[in-house]
């Protein structure tokens, strides 16, 4: 467990889990949102993002937090461990709302309200994204440890079980 990706619906607890995993393992943590977004709410080019992601994937160890479906298959091919947060919609919406007004490491600004487009992304994640994620997990399962969390309690239990 040295090349880890943490994926799942926004608001599901991915980042909190990734930070706890980093603290427990000492592995470097990379936030895809922090790579993609600039402080002015614009983003870097796809080429620059791809270059930075390739540099991370070439490392001996990492934890990568985030979805970015365009590059998910590349990350799945490179990693040895996947943590998927497949939590109920209500939990994810509550998670996204609970972080409003708070500074975060993964985005360079503070949201004070839930953006309607972001809310739609969360609401559509189960129908739009999860089927493809599960398909890619089946395709790239060989030689990988895949852990699927259905609750934050399961994720916390996993962290507590690490030595």
Tell what function each PLM region has.
Residues 6:
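Hydrophobic anchor at the beta1->P-loop junction of P-loop NTPases
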Residues 9:
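P-loop (Walker A) phosphate-binding loop of NTP-binding proteins
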Residues 12:
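ATP-binding Walker
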Residues 15:
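Walker A/P-loop
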Residues 24, 124-163:
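NTP-dependent small-molecule kinase module
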Residues 28-82:
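Conserved nucleotide-sensing/catalytic segment adjacent to the nucleotide-binding pocket
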Residues 87-132:
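A glycine- and Lys/Arg-enriched "phosphate-lid" helix/loop adjacent to the NTP-binding pocket
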């Amino acid at each position: 467990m040295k090349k880890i990706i943490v994926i799942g619906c926004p608001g599901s607890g991915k980042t909190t889990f990734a930070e706890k995993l980093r603290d427990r393992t000492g592995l470097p943590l990379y936030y895809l949102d922090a790579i993609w977004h600039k402080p002015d709410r614009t983003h870097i080019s796809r080429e620059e993002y791809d270059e930075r992601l390739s540099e991370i994937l070439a490392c001996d160890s990492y934890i990568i937090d985030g979805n970015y479906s365009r590059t998910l298959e590349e990350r799945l091919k490179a990693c040895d461990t996947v943590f998927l947060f497949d939590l109920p919609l209500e939990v994810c919406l509550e998670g996204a709302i609970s972080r409003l007004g708070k500074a975060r490491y993964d985005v360079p600004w503070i949201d004070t309200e839930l953006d309607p487009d972001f809310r739609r992304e969360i609401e559509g994640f189960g129908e739009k994204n999860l089927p493809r994620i599960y398909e890619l997990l089946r395709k790239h399962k060989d030689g990988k440890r895949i852990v699927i969390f259905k609750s934050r309690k399961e994720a916390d239990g996993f962290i507590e079980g690490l030595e």
